[in-house]
Amino acid sequence: IDVQIIPFLDLKQTDLSPFEGFVISGAPILLTEIDPEPYINAFRWILNENRPILGICFGHQILGLLHGARVARMKEDRDFQEIEVIKDDLLFERLPDVFEMQEDHCEHISVPKNFDLLACSDACINEAMKHKDKLHYGVQFHPEVSGNYGNILLENFTALVMSQQKK
């Protein structure tokens, strides 16, 4: 699978049509301390997007804000946290019902009305969510730095992207 990194500042002038799926990464931005509108506007294309999307941390929050979620401050969480799956989904295939993932945030979002809550933790109610009609996922934790379980989750998302190519 080919992967291309597109810096945020290059997003507006990048043709996204060749891509099969998207990962929107974390960012050192506190949405409660800035005007989030420029970021929401930069990602507004997601609202009409049917290809798979995985939002991680900041990406999770942006995905939620686009769909009406609210962002709020919380106790800082910068360690591994036990994540509990509360709704089965292909994103969690081959993972136990409770697994550890690395956290690095001090904000959280509510669950938008057109999303299902998939996972929670003691620190954060909305650890993972999925759009009810699309393969649009958000995870508050950081699978990319969470070892084997994180790798499995990213492999699962990649498999979801590849399954859509065949349709």
Where are these regions (language model features)?
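Short amphipathic alpha-helical segments
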Residues: I34-E37, H67-A69, N114, I152
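Catalytic nucleophile loop
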Residues: L47-G68
